[in-house]
């Protein structure tokens, strides 16, 4: 960032203090800084962070700041609309959770990459085998971990299936949830059925651990993880893994989770006009082209060349209608945390899919009614 920010400092006769915060507990550290009056003028935020800051007035509505050119230049500008306002400018996107498959396993099974739930379940069943004849399953259909203590694995274990079934988390008015409706129950029942083809220790491992111990070593036909895992995990740790990917399965529609993170103007900024100018500068075609040359990612602005992983170029160009972020709604973090724990009880068998979803929905709706 230094050469990019140097240009801004010189042009605007100011100094920019860029602070990089480690990802672990990022949202908690961010919130603590704001409550202590030590927050940034411009903050990097992801969807789950926004509700509390919008409700407390800590983040500025950009409706009167963003120009027509700003909006036209941004590829993912629609994601800026949150809870009745415009609270950020898209900064990081096009790194969705894709369905990876083991090409060698599918070839041995005589199967092509799946398109539908029916395809997926059939292949998972065929792939789940005792390959060495010792009486124990040693190859699985799906490497899926349910042991994470926090809700982040909803990105791979829940949202894609919910959206593919035609469901969503919130009703349109954001005053109640809908994930326990017919579509949500279809998704939950499907996930429960898939557990016959998932390693038995799924409740003791998270998704990353399942990839490291099962999919990466070639012991599963499928897993779901960020497209960037191709470089950060497979290329680094499993260079011999023969993999391919499907952007998202289809039931009622094709869908998968793809976060869009934003740069936001914080209400505590003393010079809001200058702070917004910084956002504009950082997100300009020139700046993003320079940044993505050093840190390869898909374009965030129109006119920017593609400098990301070539293996995902076609996906980025053609599947923008398949991957999507969360709808930002009130009490998001509390709702997601509770839902995750209820889904874990479903996987463990302590509750039926309907019981788990209904209990999570009751908690959520009681919270939203306060």
Task: Go through each PLM region and give its residues.
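Glycine-centered hinge/linker elements that transmit conformational signals in sensory
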Residues: 123-126, 173-204
């Amino acid at each position: 960032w230094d050469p990019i920010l140097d240009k801004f400092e010189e042009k605007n006769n100011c100094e920019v203090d860029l602070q990089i915060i480690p990802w672990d507990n990022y949202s908690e550290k961010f919130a603590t800084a704001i409550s202590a009056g030590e927050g940034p003028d411009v903050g990097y935020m992801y969807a789950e962070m926004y509700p509390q800051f919008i409700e407390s007035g800590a983040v500025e509505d950009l409706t009167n700041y963003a120009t027509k050119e700003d909006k036209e230049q941004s590829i993912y500008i629609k994601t800026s609309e949150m809870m009745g306002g415009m609270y950020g400018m898209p900064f990081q996107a096009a790194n969705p959770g894709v369905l990876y498959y083991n090409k060698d396993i599918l070839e041995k099974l005589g199967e092509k990459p799946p398109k539908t739930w029916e395809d997926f379940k059939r292949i998972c069943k065929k792939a789940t085998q005792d390959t060495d004849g010792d009486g124990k399953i040693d190859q699985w259909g799906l490497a899926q971990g349910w042991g994470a203590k926090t809700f982040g694995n909803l990105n791979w274990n829940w949202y894609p299936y919910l959206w593919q079934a035609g469901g969503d988390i919130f009703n349109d008015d954001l005053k109640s949830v809908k994930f326990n409706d017919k579509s949500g129950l279809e998704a939950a029942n499907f996930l429960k059925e898939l557990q016959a083809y998932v390693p038995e220790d799924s409740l003791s491992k998270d998704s990353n651990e399942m990839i490291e111990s099962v999919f990466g070593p070639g012991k599963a036909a499928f897993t779901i993880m960020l497209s960037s895992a191709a470089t950060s995990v497979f290329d680094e740790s499993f260079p011999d893994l023969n993999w391919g990917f499907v952007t998202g399965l289809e039931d009622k529609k094709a869908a998968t989770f793809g976060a869009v993170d934003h740069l936001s103007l914080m209400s505590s900024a003393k010079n809001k006009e200058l702070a917004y100018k910084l956002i504009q500068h950082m997100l300009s075609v020139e700046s993003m082209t320079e940044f993505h040359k050093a840190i390869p990612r898909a374009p965030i602005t129109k006119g920017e060349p593609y400098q990301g992983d070539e293996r995902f170029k076609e996906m980025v160009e053609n599947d923008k209608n398949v991957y999507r972020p969360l709808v930002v709604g009130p009490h998001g973090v509390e709702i997601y945390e509770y839902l995750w724990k209820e889904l874990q009880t479903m996987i463990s068998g302590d509750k039926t899919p309907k019981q788990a979803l209904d209990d999570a929905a009751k908690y959520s709706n009681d919270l939203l009614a306060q």
